[in-house]
């Protein structure tokens, strides 16, 4: 186990969410080498830890950063405690990122700011729950569930979409998800391995 691999924690908010999402792992290589990655609403930091292991600097941002406190001594990890839902937008000024990762989180007013915070050739990797998920598990509140095609519509005009999916997944349990990988580039993006 490397120093940046997450360790199981029985008090985790997202039980069983120790390993990075396969969607994030698949598209992580699209983040330009040496650039800083933003793990937004990072929770345990499982995705940011993956990018640390890939050699990136990472900004871990969440309202409660206690689950990434073990990274406080790492010079490549910046920990930012902020409530993203106060209406102030991203608390990161004009910074641009080589990658932005968001999973299992939706605050619609932030979507335009995410595209604006992505640096040239940077990659946005976003995966969260969609409408219909309420039939299987939480979240059930429509405010926390993407409408069909919403993620594509939010980023398809500003970024080059490399991959998009919306539908029912059965692993590890049934859920409706939407996910997108998109780059801030006019040039054709290399396709990630399947």
What are these regions (language model features)?
Residues 1-32:
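S-adenosyl-L-methionine
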Residues 45-87:
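Class I SAM-dependent methyltransferase SAM/SAH-binding core
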Residues 106-118:
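A short, conserved alpha-helix within the catalytic core of class I
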Residues 122-133:
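Conserved beta-strand signature within the Rossmann-like core of class I S-adenosyl-L-methionine
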Residues 143-158:
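Short alpha-helix
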Residues 169-194:
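Core SAM-dependent methyltransferase catalytic element
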